[in-house]
Amino acid sequence: MDKENFTRLRGELFCDHPLARYTSWRVGGKAERFYRPADLFDLQDFLTQLPSDEPLTWLGLGSNVLIRDGGIKGTVILTLNRLKELSVVNSQLVFREKSGTEDFFSGNGKTIIRAEAGVTCAKLAKFCVSQGLEDGAFFAGIPGTVGGALAMNAGAFGGETWRTVIGVETMNHQGEILKRTPDEFKIHYRQVEGLENQFFIAGYFCFNHGDPDKAKTAINALLKKRNLSQPIGKYSCGSVFRNPPGDYAARLIESAGLKGKSIGNAEVSEKHANFILNKGNASAADIEALIHYVAQHVSQIHGIQLVKEVHIIGRS
């Protein structure tokens, strides 16, 4: 499919488009097609014109994904700063048509925020602070977008995305928007089941009212803690592995003597062992090889099989 096959589009469509600059590792091949929608309604128009069997890949901040050097078949959709609506909503109107009752999500002294998938978690955290919602400050520690946070139940500083979620909007391949509630999904540590070929396009988050100054203090303290313990400013994806029950992946990797271990131009961070860095011109193959090496070595030393938190996609 070429650009000539589409009409009414207000977004930007590219063919054979390099993807490395859209990922926090700065690696990866090309997308056969790459679309940046103008907004949610433009995205709907685009999807209705795609073949029903077109492979779709959704990309936000690109911070929890490793795209292989061979690139991605089908169409990649970039939500970052495109699905960007962020607002306080009337809690009594949220999902009323689904529940059949006006008080399905009554306020009860809380604030409900609707954030679209392309909003960064950092922006959501700052918005929470501006509203005096201290319990939303933990989103500042998640290096991704709302869509990605919903898809993997991302967390930081003891907080988890789905603990704050009261509802979501999803979109299917035909561009139809569905409103769904948390009980329709199986929520796990860094894993969410139940999308069934749909994609998160917005979340409704419920927070307690609080003092704006206390909320600002909380977010600053959390960011200071993160900056002291993580290699901020380096090319990485954040945490590579999930923490196993009762332990920490970083502790296991460090105690296995793997800090500073390199393959090609990929390196296990000296500052935080659960981060793998692109030292400048690493390939996706370098990083994937190092991920497998770390997992195998930790298994040999500790007898624990680390589970990847990062998603590896695309063609080798």
From Swiss-Prot:
One of its GO terms (biological process) is cell division. Pathway: Cell wall biogenesis; peptidoglycan biosynthesis. The keyword Lyase does not apply. It is an enzyme of class 1 (oxidoreductase). Pfam families: FAD_binding_4, MurB_C. Its main location: cytoplasm. Residues 27-225 form the FAD-binding PCMH-type domain. InterPro entries: FAD-bd_PCMH, FAD-bd_PCMH-like_sf, FAD-bd_PCMH_sub1, FAD-bd_PCMH_sub2, MurB, MurB_C, MurB_C_sf, Oxid_FAD_bind_N. It catalyses: UDP-N-acetyl-alpha-D-muramate + NADP(+) = UDP-N-acetyl-3-O-(1-carboxyvinyl)-alpha-D-glucosamine + NADPH + H(+). Its EC number is 1.3.1.98. It is found in: Cytoplasm. One of its GO terms (molecular function) is UDP-N-acetylmuramate dehydrogenase activity. Keywords: Cell cycle, Cell division, Cell shape, Cell wall biogenesis/degradation, Cytoplasm, FAD, Flavoprotein, NADP, Oxidoreductase, Peptidoglycan synthesis. It comes from the Bacteria. Its cofactor is FAD. GO terms for cellular component: cytosol. The active site is at 190, 239 (proton donor), 309. The keyword Zinc-finger does not apply. Cell wall formation. Belongs to the MurB family. This is UDP-N-acetylenolpyruvoylglucosamine reductase. It comes from Coxiella burnetii (strain RSA 493 / Nine Mile phase I).
